[in-house]
């Protein structure tokens, strides 16, 4: 009987250890879409001091490069694909970004407040 109890307890402990992190613990997601060589929305607001995930969906056929010198981030997003960028907690302020392949039209900013 003791062996069965120990095995059940060990099994439950293993199950709990392998349980994924709850969604409430995950950083918030901020969606951006690339379409017709533009970002939409062209301004997003995030909470200053809190990390977040930038989810960028490229609806165009061609690739676009998300680039922010302010954030020191560069990421190519293939046409028809979505990428997720984990962003660190930002100080309050405005951070600009562009689509490097279409800098005249693909522009935006992240406002941390």
Task: Describe the function of each predicted region.
Residues 6-17:
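Bacterial N-terminal signal peptides
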